[in-house]
Regions:
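Non-catalytic nucleic-acid substrate-recognition regions in nucleic-acid-modifying enzymes
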Residues: 1-20
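Conserved AdoMet
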Residues: 25-103
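Residue-level signal for inorganic ion chemistry
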Residues: 26, 64, 94, 125, ...
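Conserved beta-strand segments of alpha/beta enzyme cores
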Residues: 80, 137, 161-163, 255-258
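Conserved SAM/SAH cofactor-binding pocket of Class I
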Residues: 96-195
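Mobile active-site "lid"/loop adjacent to the S-adenosyl-L-methionine
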Residues: 186-215
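Conserved Class I SAM-dependent methyltransferase catalytic core
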Residues: 211-274
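Flexible, glycine-/basic-rich loop-and-beta segments that form/coincide
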Residues: 276-282
């Protein structure tokens, strides 16, 4: 290969269809330099090996592989988290769920709250909550061994003490009750055209099949046995599923049922409160 400079490599990446920022981040990681360095040193030469590795990364990105997989990490709610194949990439819209949870916890002073995160994936939700509320006792459940290993690694990386539990939804939490439960479960319906664009991420973390509501139904149905009276259940869902999820919560006798929108203004999270004095507590 002839001599290739930083500017040449970035121009070639754009011709491949790679976004300018994505290409800069990939090259900065490869060179172990900040992105600003690339801008100030666009005439710096690349070795043959660097050219080859950058071209390979750009080809993968152009084919739709998530940038987070190529970089090996993704920022979420102020925390840089390890991610990789087999683990769902944390989305900024899920921060809506975390912010809502923190509001509820702030409104309930007193003893350290008990919180559960069902289907934790990379640990994003659980770790963001623990980082913001070190006093909280947080339990995170995940059925994927690959994802759970990543979540544990992220916890160690940030020195955050979360109780990691292997299992499916409520199964590892028998006999436990919480003040707050959150979940970002698989909710994309089978056949949804968006799934094709997400083909590099684990299907089981994206879609439960059918109408996309089966895991949400299971979580709502089991929640009364695992929430303290007055406890809250918060759920992420598809932008067109808010009405259906609110109906599930109302059918399970939740009160104060409401929906919040994501960063783009789309209905993204719904939640409700278990009655302060439920029939089972009488």
């Amino acid at each position: 290969m002839s001599e290739v400079r930083v500017a040449d490599a970035l121009a070639a990446a754009r011709r491949q269809g790679v976004d300018r920022l994505d290409a800069q981040l990939l090259l900065a990681r490869l060179l172990q330099r900040p992105r600003e360095w690339l801008i100030a040193h666009d005439d710096a030469p690349l070795s043959v090996g660097q050219q080859q590795r950058f071209a390979a990364d750009c080809a993968r990105r152009a084919a739709g592989e998530p940038l987070a997989y190529l970089l090996g990490e993704r920022e979420f709610h102020g925390l840089m988290l390890q991610v990789g194949p087999g683990v769902l990439v944390p989305r900024p819209d899920t921060e809506t769920l975390v912010d809502w949870a923190l509001e509820l916890l702030a409104a309930k002073p007193g003893a350290a709250p008990a919180v559960a995160d069902l289907g934790t994936g990379s640990g994003a939700i659980a770790l963001a909550l623990k980082h913001a509320r070190p006093d909280a006792r947080i339990c995170a459940v995940e059925h994927s061994e690959v994802a759970l290993a990543v979540a544990r690694a992220n916890g160690r990386r940030h020195g955050l003490d979360v109780q990691w539990q292997a299992g499916s939804w409520w199964q590892p939490l028998q006999g436990q009750r919480f003040d707050l439960v959150l979940s970002n479960p698989p909710y994309i319906a089978a056949g949804d055209p968006h799934l094709a664009a997400l083909r590099h991420e684990p299907l089981q973390a994206l879609s439960p099949g059918g109408d996309g509501l089966s895991d949400l139904r299971h979580i709502v149905q089991g929640a009364p046995l695992h929430l303290q009276p007055g406890g809250w259940l918060l759920l992420e869902h598809g932008h067109d599923q808010a009405e259906a999820v609110r109906a599930l919560l109302l059918q399970a006798d939740f009160t104060q049922v409401t929906t919040r929108s994501d960063l783009g203004g789309r209905p993204r999270c719904s939640g409700g409160r278990r009655a302060v004095r439920a029939p089972s507590d009488a």
